[in-house]
Amino acid sequence: MNIHEYQGKEILRKYNVPVPRGIPAFSVDEALKAAETLGGPVWVVKAQIHAGGRGKGGGVKVAKSIDDVKTYASNILGMQLVTHQTGPEGKKVNRLLIEEGADIKKELYVSLVVDRVSQKVALMASSEGGMDIEEVAAHSPEKIHTLIIEPSVGLTDAEADDIARKIGVPDTSVAQARQALQGLYKAFYETDASLAEINPLILTGDGKVIALDAKFNFDSNALFRHPEIVAYRDLDEEDANEIEASKFDLAYISLDGNIGCLVNGAGLAMATMDTIKLFGGEPANFLDVGGGATTEKVTEAFKLMLSNKNVQAILVNIFGGIMRCDVIAEGVISASKAVHLTVPLVVRMKGTNEDLGKKMLADSGLPIISADTMEEAAQKVVAAAAGK
């Protein structure tokens, strides 16, 4: 689950990480009141969407008067903000953060992620803040410093000080940087976050260390422990299909391709998408129906896939272990009839009651394309999507 910048800063504030004074606003009038409450002479008007690159997309403006605040708030609220993370369709801006201006002397980068190799939390820091860390990694990898944190110990004073100095924090500000880094780690750990990022972490002209931005992602499987985090959820920022899928216990993620995928098991689903890509196709979604799929779940899965107007063909790839192939076949037949399927459908089933499932599909009278291997299924669905 993702949250907005201003919500991330609320979390940081609780963990004693210095952040600028700011007030969220949902209308132009609220933006003006926020600016008046904060006082001038400089404010920053920030679009609040779940995506990075807002500044380059015109979603962050520095205002030097109340009139500027009004103009920028009017322009940004309701706009369809397009960034490198939103895709060409962009995201509608429904809320703003009005924040006091900052005297930026230097921009730094810090983040915490789970390192899958060490199975521990990794702290990444760089002297190159204010830009995408991917760009830094590509062009100046030596400027990224990584520290694997021992969970039984946490981020020690010595480790925090060392990282701070490596990214260019002067000795007079190291203690402040230590406080920010340790606060960020504690926030990450205690909220079950999967990502915590401050970009940029700034040094001001008078030597203060301040988090000028905040990005948090949370492990959805741990949200039951954090009702205060769940309260931050903004459904307007989430994919409508993904919200609908969650109601039926379907793991669904929208993608940019034109081939719908219905698979049981996350590993097989990813392998299926890889194979489609291998043969020149583009998956339109990740969809794992799990091991307890019913006819209702399969029907809802078809509805989800077909709600994407880009879908030109569908691949159903099932391994019948816990899930029986005849149950899936029944669901596929029922779903195809219920949604009046008009796009090509390729089905590959292996495992429990495989022969019965295949017979049910063959006897259904539906124009279903059968395949025996994953490679064959991928080739056939790519060809079908291309109209061949």
From Swiss-Prot:
Pfam family, one: ATP-grasp_2
Name this protein carries in UniProt: Succinate--CoA ligase [ADP-forming] subunit beta
Keywords linked to the UniProt accession: ATP-binding, Ligase, Magnesium, Metal-binding, Nucleotide-binding, Tricarboxylic acid cycle
Reaction equation(s) it catalyzes: succinate + ATP + CoA = succinyl-CoA + ADP + phosphate; GTP + succinate + CoA = succinyl-CoA + GDP + phosphate
EC number in record: 6.2.1.5
Biological process (GO), any one: tricarboxylic acid cycle
Cofactor needs: Mg(2+)
NCBIfam families: PRK00696.1, sucCoAbeta
Top-level enzyme category: ligase
Positions with a binding annotation for substrate: N264, G321, I322, M323
Annotated Gene3D superfamilies: ATP-grasp fold, A domain, ATP-grasp fold, B domain, Succinyl-CoA synthetase domains
GO cellular component: cytosol; succinate-CoA ligase complex
Cofactor binding comment, as recorded: Binds 1 Mg(2+) ion per subunit.
UniProt subunit comment: Heterotetramer of two alpha and two beta subunits.
